[in-house]
Amino acid sequence: MGQEKVTVSTRPLQWKCVESRADSKRLYYGRFLLAPLMRGQADTIGIAMRRALLGEIEGTCITRAKSEKIPHEYSTIVGIQESVHEILMNLKEIVLRSNLYGTRDASICVKGPGYVTAQDIILPPSVEIVDNTQHIANLTEPITLCIELQIERNRGYRIKTPNNFQNGSYPIDAVFMPVRNANHSIHSYVNGNENQEILFLEIWTNGSLTPKEALHEASRNLIDLFIPFFHAEEHLENNQHKGTLPLFNFHGRLAKPRKTKKEIALKYIYIDQSELPPRVYNCLKRSNINTFLELLNNSQEELMKIQDFRIEDVKHILDVLEI
């Protein structure tokens, strides 16, 4: 823990952790370097890594809560200091670590008076709490508070919608991203007759992953995205004589089926890697559209049925894809 003196060898390319610390159970910091890089490479890698760190790494959150004592989200319960809304906000802040897939059930059942904290959550075996001291509620009277919880592993974030209330349960805004922030900076220097660069990456996490683990996972995700390009030519040769269905079926420019490298690559390009406006991105994520291939397999009419999606958004998507 602490800062090391940075020394860079001109060859070969190397990476190093130059600073690492835990500011709290829910705030880790790491600083890394990669060098030597040719001019322009540091920015290319830095931008890609930042996007992968913030958008491609999965995390685990509480996404839904249910209790018979809750008439509606903005109600209060006798014997509990916090309102229902405040309890839901406290549940949103709970940081979990897991390797689960899909959703799991958890629960809280505590008799007052006393404080309810994260350590009172009864979790499935595959899930653990990063900070057991996180506050949930204060029971001021001898009442019993029982809450059923839903835990989910995903990536990005999900904003609750008014029509997402089911059987007296309440959705919770989910921020799945274990990386709180990521920045990159570049140090340029001259080595002989060459202009070279050092890339510095700064990563802050919520404690469910260390910055080093986040860096490794983001790197793996980027590699997985690029691997298909190595096989694209072979894939095209094997399929050039086969009949195919139209890949794009909205907008006149996309009416004819075309098996190009770009179209094949769309399967592996996620919408959060693009420059889509936040409103358009949220519309698509709510409709479970994660990749551009999934997006373009919808007709324009189907897209227009998505809540808050507008006709001009179609043109914006086409401009982003440059098709």
UniProtKB/Swiss-Prot annotation:
Pfam family, one: RNA_pol_A_bac
Protein name per UniProt: DNA-directed RNA polymerase subunit alpha
Main location as per UniProt: plastid
Function: DNA-dependent RNA polymerase catalyzes the transcription of DNA into RNA using the four ribonucleoside triphosphates as substrates.
Native species: Morus indica
Localisation per UniProt entry: Plastid, Chloroplast
Keywords attached to this entry: Chloroplast, DNA-directed RNA polymerase, Nucleotidyltransferase, Plastid, Transcription, Transferase
EC number of this enzyme: 2.7.7.6
Assembly notes: In plastids the minimal PEP RNA polymerase catalytic core is composed of four subunits: alpha, beta, beta', and beta''. When a (nuclear-encoded) sigma factor is associated with the core the holoenzyme is formed, which can initiate transcription.
CDD domains, sorted: RNAP_alpha_NTD (cd06928)
Coiled coil: none
Domain writeup: The N-terminal domain is essential for RNAP assembly and basal transcription, whereas the C-terminal domain is involved in interaction with transcriptional regulators and with upstream promoter elements.
Domain of life: Eukaryota
Start and end residues of each stretch annotated as Alpha C-terminal domain (alpha-CTD): 264-323
GO molecular function, one term: protein dimerization activity
Alpha N-terminal domain (alpha-NTD), as annotated region: 1-233
Cellular component, GO annotation: chloroplast; DNA-directed RNA polymerase complex; mitochondrion
GO biological process: DNA-templated transcription
Membership in a protein family: Belongs to the RNA polymerase alpha chain family.
Top-level class of the enzyme under EC nomenclature: transferase
InterPro entries according to UniProt: DNA-dir_RNA_pol_insert, DNA-dir_RNA_pol_RpoA/D/Rpb3, DNA-dir_RpoA, RBP11-like, RNAP_asu_C, RNApol_insert_sf
Gene3D superfamilies: 5' to 3' exonuclease, C-terminal subdomain (1.10.150.20), DNA-directed RNA polymerase, insert domain (2.170.120.12), RNA polymerase, RBP11-like subunit (3.30.1360.10)
Catalysed conversion reaction: RNA(n) + a ribonucleoside 5'-triphosphate = RNA(n+1) + diphosphate
